[in-house]
């Protein structure tokens, strides 16, 4: 990886691989469904539990029907539809249908509270909602037209089947032309500052991301890949990295609406899943949960798993590889503000070869990356940790109706500031150290929670862990470990403290241990540190 010294002495890093072309004229649905004619009988989505399936023929037909119906109901270019659904077989059709009508897809978490969904609906200026009977109660009072999936007809709502049939009867309308520069998605992200914001993504953004991430897919893989659809489809990785990427490759998505280890393993075996994007807590489950031993793992056709969202502890990776020797583990890195995946392991030059263990991979084609000193903004050379910044055609247009936060995140040169600390080594592999906002400042030293968590997970009695900062009068902040201990373990707080102390520099020592029943995590697998910290502080006050 050659660093490019610019006139202003910036260290800018680019991909080892040549640039890939990005088509100019296509919308995202057109791009994703290119070449679909040969695959109309192939299953595009199947639900792991119910077996309900849709073919590529269904996807093409119903995407058109939905787009026509939404247009006839008054949806216009740039207007938002909020989708409140679990991972169902129709999800891809719904997203593509909204986009084909010129609308903007905004997925919401179906497990969210009514108040949280209301915030997203209001913040996005949504014109309608698509949901199912289970979630209808959450959205019926929001004052918008509601389309409900399923056979059941609900008074006051539009039935999905009826809507599609109405779409059949609609003639072709003179829609305003949809351009690549038009918005097509408005996912909500906490960004680098913690509060939920709408991320404005265009057709061009998402097509550019798919071109970069899929550059290594060989022609013989088209129509062959079976992907597990467990990561929520309302999440950027779910809709782009799973749904759109798999449809582009004419593979099959096995949709799971919730995580259950037995259902998960059954789905992998029964549907011959070859690629499973998952989160680190599931890796932990696969390594440590005795339920796994109930299954004949020799029946697995799984070739690779990809983890993102949180760093994978090196010892956990080793344990997983020992248990699943034929499954390749790829760690990836992405963010909503960059349209999904940004760095990844797959290497077309080496077949399924990957980057170094515990790196998040290499720079994808068409991307530029630099690392800056968070205090001075100065760009840094190889092997020097700094804030990861990325520049490409995948960078969002900004946060919806929030110029102040946009300006904090994207600078005048078009660099997206990720809020993550990392470095690039001599071979072009990138390593993420931690998030700026999660670094613990102990007596002026920066301590990365992820590093301490990785060490603690090597302890045989530790089943899960999270390290959080606690305020301290003398040190500023101290690292405190919230530990899920094996019920049969005899270790006390002091044993855990000594275990870490034997493995780190003095300033990185864990200063307090709290035994907890579980570690709260978001649906995407990220540790909810603030929740843990607040809980400890409230206990300490009593």
Swiss-Prot record:
ATP binds at residues 189-193, 197, 331-332, 336, 420, 435, 526. Mostly confined to anther tapetal cells. Both substrate-binding domains (SBD1 and SBD2) are involved in the substrate recognition, and are sufficient to confer the substrate specificity. The keyword Protease does not apply. The keyword Ribosomal protein does not apply. Coiled coil: none annotated. Pfam families: AMP-binding, AMP-binding_C. Residues 260-331 are annotated as: SBD1. Belongs to the ATP-dependent AMP-binding enzyme family. One of its GO terms (cellular component) is endoplasmic reticulum. CoA binds at residues 258, 443-444. Its EC number is 6.2.1.12. Its main location: endoplasmic reticulum. Its cofactor is Mg(2+). It comes from the Eukaryota. It is found in: Endoplasmic reticulum. Transmembrane segments: none annotated. It catalyses: (E)-4-coumarate + ATP + CoA = (E)-4-coumaroyl-CoA + AMP + diphosphate; (E)-4-coumarate + ATP + H(+) = (E)-4-coumaroyl-AMP + diphosphate; (E)-4-coumaroyl-AMP + CoA = (E)-4-coumaroyl-CoA + AMP + H(+). Interacts with TKPR1, PKSA and PKSB. Keywords: ATP-binding, Endoplasmic reticulum, Ligase, Magnesium, Nucleotide-binding. It comes from Arabidopsis thaliana. One of its GO terms (biological process) is fatty-acyl-CoA biosynthetic process. This is 4-coumarate--CoA ligase-like 1.
